[in-house]
């Protein structure tokens, strides 16, 4: 695991014939994003500078499915790959370009609103 991208397992607190129940903690409130991604699709492909509190770090929860997170630290050039298997929280530090590859159909819960990325989302060529 690195300081740039972390995969944090989501704690299971119960399971029965209906399925399982998991918990996580966050200090974030307000609007959130739920994304349904098809197998093979790419998301992200950008980085944040941490101007928005909710992008410092960026936090997404893989609720269903599996993803590969490719990343590059913009400041150091360090590169890495992390595998997230639901349920898991992915944290992405500022100044880390990231690409989320849906290894299978997946459901993603983002702990931020669309407005949080405005003015704090950059492509590699910027």
What are these regions (language model features)?
Residues 27, 62, 85, 93-95, ...:
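A short, compositionally biased micro-patch
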Residues 55-72:
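Glycine- and acidic-residue-biased ligand/ion/polar-headgroup-sensing regions
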Residues 3-6, 99-126:
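Double-stranded beta-helix
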Residues 14, 34-56:
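Conserved short histidine dyad/triad with adjacent acidic residue
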Residues 1-34:
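A short, N-terminal "cap"/entry segment at the start of jelly-roll beta-barrel domains
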Residues 14, 73-94:
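Short acidic-glycine-tyrosine-enriched beta hairpin
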Residues 51, 75-77, 107, 115-116:
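Short, surface-exposed beta-strand-loop junctions and turns on beta-sheet-rich folds
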Residues 21, 45, 69-70, 92, ...:
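Short beta-strand His + acidic residue motifs that chelate non-heme Fe in jelly-roll/DSBH
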